[in-house]
Every structure is written in structure tokens, then in C-alpha cells.
């Protein structure tokens, strides 16, 4: 089966918004063992849409079309598909009734413009959208099925998961025997990881892929077929052994997610004091429901005065060692933990750049501490200074990993291949 994707919208074509739908769809299909072979982005011009539908339908077996199903004048996907096939738009009575019911349930009067969303190509098969007003549909043109989906990410994900994936499995008799293991890493570049893994002799049906999403690189281990699935745990275990401390989570999208679930299930509490990370550690945890059960407070103590007055850092420590130092960050962590007697506290202080560095402490120098009931662990690391965002996100990741290792009763401070360290 040859799968392609057509993304629509002037704002997508012009780069005014990042096409996260395309990235999500490609990643999701990969996890189902299907690779997208081509992706095309086209603006909201009727003639361009007609042309791309006609041209790509000669080459693909299935095309997922995303966007252009709304009620406004620049939503042209249904009209373009009808013209590409040489047929009329007709009202889908079932979807019109669904639209009217939706507005009634929400105590709203339905604008006449929304009736456009019930107009489908004459030969179209309606595809349900249980979470929105845009009607999905599929049409056969030339050799391809074109499957039309809304641009709203939440609606797209429902439709792909509940409608598209079952459709292609049935239509093309796809082998559903596909399994995936994800390993999340930090502290090593993609090329360094590949150098370690490419020499491995993998069993038949096992393949490895990489996805860079700084500060993490995700390793995806695919198993296709019953025999490959049976040996997947053994292969994943061997890869973890080869990569060592670089692997920080399994089947989690971020290290913050790993920490969230470990704390959620442990009954332990956490406080955070952040300087250079500016609330990033706290914010990433708050993204997950239930974080209030363990996260007691998150403080952004950016100025020296706030470090002294809020966290109780000794002014002489700042005078003698500076804000970016082991001594200061240890006092920050201790102070943050003591405020509410948390089980743990993380603290960061560093130079994120692009300015502020010195010969002794260049941009990318970050001090991180973890305070526990039994003592304090700390280190001062040297991070790549490619960007301010990278320094901050890597700092948060290393802080999370220190806490993760403490929760597992492992060595809290370890070496990472691409991260230097000034002091333990």
C-alpha cells in the first residue's frame, strides 16, 4: 500500500503555523507499521487543490487530506474533490441533522454558513466526526482512496484512530502484527547513538528508527511479525545495555512524563526552585493531570534577592561563589525543600545565554542540585550553547534524570557523552 498525505491551507504553506498534524500523522502511521511515501502542502486555491488531487490519485493507493472542511469561503476541499471527479456537491442529510443537533445541544443558533459542512461530493462516503462539526468523507479517484479529515488536531486524531486506521487495515489487508518499543535518551547525539547501534545484528523483522526532539532523542524499535514481536523485549534490553546511562525512559514521550508517573505512584512530594530554567521544570510536570498530588510548589527565583529572601540563600554564598555555583544551588534546593518539608527539591541556576558568560563560567554553565531528606546531590555541567532554549531544556532534563535515578536508588550523578561536568 502506498500512502501519501496532502496538507491544505495558506497559513501552513506560508509557514505561519507549524504543521504538527502532519508530524503526528506520520509518527502514528509509523507506529502501525505504515510509512508515508510522500507529503504535499497546497494553499487554498481551488485550481491547485483540483490539480493535486487528480495528479496524486494516479500514484497513491490512499491519500489522507487534512484541512479545508470548515464553513468559511477558504475551506475548499469538498468542492475541489467534487470538481476533480467531475461530479456535483450534494447535501448529506445525515450530517445536516447532526449539525443541527450539535448546535441545539450547545444552546446556539446554527449560522447558515455551517450548512456548507454538510455538502459532500456525490460519490463520497461519510466519515464520522464525533467531536466536531466538520464532516469527514472518503472518495475513490483513479487508483486512490482520498480520505478527508478536519484541520483541528483533536478532531483529526479521533478520525485517524477510530476511522482511518481500521479502514486501511480492512481495505488493504494489512498485517496487524506490529509492535513498537520506544527508548528515550539524553546526553548523546543521534550520530553517536547510531554508531553504537548500527553494528548490532538485529533479528529478522526488527528495525530501528531515530527521532530527535531536543533535549531528547527517541529510539524506536519496530517488530513486524510474530517472531520479531516475540524477541522484541530481548532486543530492547540489549540496546539499553549498549547505550547505558543515555536511556532515561521507556515508552514515554518525555522525561517529565516519566518523572510524573514515578512521583504519582510513589506518594512522595517535590518542590522546585528555578533560575535559568525559568519555571520549565514545574511547567512540564503541571502539563499532566494529577501533578497536584506530589508537586508542592515551583518557584522562579531569578534574582539574587529572591534567592536570599525566598529560599534563604546566604548572601555571603552569593558574594563568594556567585549565583551559578554548587554552593548557591545547594542552598536553593535545601531552602525549597524546607518550605513545605517536601521529600525532594530540585534547583537550577545557570547561564543560558547568549550573553553573560565568562572565561571561568561560559554560556552553557549550569549548576543543578537535588535535595533529599538524607542530603544534597549537586553538579555543575557544561552544555552545548547552540541556543538559549537548548541550554534550558537540557538543564531541565538533567535535573529530572537526577531525581529519576534517586527514585530508582541508582547513582544520582552520571556521565553523559555530550555533556561536560565541572564538578561533582
UniProtKB/Swiss-Prot annotation:
Pfam families: CinA, MoCF_biosynth. This is CinA-like protein. Belongs to the CinA family.
Amino acid at each position: 500500500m502506498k500512502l501519501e498525505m496532502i496538507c491544505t491551507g495558506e497559513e501552513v504553506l506560508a509557514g505561519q503555523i507549524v504543521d504538527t498534524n502532519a508530524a503526528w500523522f506520520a509518527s502514528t502511521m509509523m507506529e502501525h507499521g505504515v510509512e508515508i511515501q510522500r507529503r504535499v502542502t497546497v494553499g487554498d486555491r481551488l485550481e491547485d487543490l483540483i490539480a493535486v488531487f487528480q495528479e496524486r490519485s494516479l500514484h497513491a493507493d490512499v491519500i489522507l487530506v487534512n484541512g479545508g472542511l470548515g464553513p468559511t469561503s477558504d475551506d475548499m476541499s469538498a468542492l475541489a474533490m467534487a470538481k476533480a471527479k467531475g461530479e456535483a456537491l450534494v447535501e448529506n442529510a445525515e450530517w445536516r441533522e447532526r449539525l443541527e443537533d450539535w448546535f441545539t445541544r450547545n444552546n446556539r443558533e446554527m449560522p447558515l454558513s455551517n450548512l456548507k459542512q454538510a455538502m459532500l461530493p456525490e460519490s463520497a462516503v461519510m466519515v464520522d466526526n464525533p467531536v466536531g462539526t466538520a464532516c469527514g468523507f472518503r472518495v475513490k479517484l483513479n487508483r486512490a482512496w482520498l480520505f478527508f479529515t478536519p484541520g483541528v488536531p483533536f478532531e483529526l486524531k479521533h478520525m485517524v484512530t477510530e476511522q482511518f486506521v481500521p479502514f486501511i487495515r480492512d481495505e488493504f489487508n494489512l498485517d496487524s502484527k506490529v509492535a513498537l518499543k520506544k527508548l528515550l535518551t539524553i546526553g548523546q547525539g543521534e550520530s553517536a547513538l547510531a554508531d553504537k547501534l548500527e553494528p548490532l545484528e538485529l533479528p529478522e523483522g526488527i528495525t530501528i528508527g531515530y527521532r530527535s526532539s531536543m533535549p531528547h532523542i527517541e529510539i524506536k524499535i519496530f517488530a513486524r511479525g510474530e517472531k520479531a514481536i516475540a524477541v522484541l523485549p530481548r532486543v530492547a534490553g540489549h540496546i539499553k545495555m549498549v547505550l547505558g546511562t543515555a536511556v532515561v525512559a521507556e515508552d514515554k514521550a518525555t522525561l517529565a512524563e516519566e518523572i510524573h508517573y514515578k512521583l504519582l505512584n510513589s506518594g512522595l512530594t517535590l518542590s522546585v526552585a528555578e533560575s535559568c530554567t525559568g519555571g520549565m521544570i514545574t511547567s512540564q510536570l503541571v502539563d499532566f493531570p494529577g501533578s497536584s498530588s506530589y508537586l508542592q510548589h515551583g518557584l522562579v527565583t531569578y534574582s539574587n534577592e529572591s534567592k536570599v529572601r525566598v529560599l534563604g540563600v546566604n548572601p555571603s554564598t552569593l558574594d563568594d561563589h556567585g549565583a551559578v555555583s554548587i554552593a548557591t544551588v545547594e542552598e536553593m534546593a535545601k531552602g525549597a525543600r524546607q518550605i513545605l518539608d517536601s521529600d525532594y527539591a530540585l534547583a537550577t541556576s545557570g547561564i543560558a545565554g547568549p550573553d553573560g558568560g565568562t572565561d571561568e563560567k561560559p554560556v552553557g554553565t549550569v549548576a543543578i542540585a537535588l535535595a533529599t531528606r538524607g542530603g544534597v546531590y549537586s553538579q555543575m555541567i557544561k552544555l552545548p550553547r547552540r541556543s538559549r532554549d537548548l541550554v534550558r531544556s537540557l538543564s531541565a532534563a538533567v535535573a529530572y534524570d537526577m531525581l529519576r535515578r534517586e527514585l530508582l536508588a541508582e547513582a544520582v550523578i552520571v556521565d553523559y557523552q555530550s555533556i561536560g561536568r565541572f564538578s561533582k
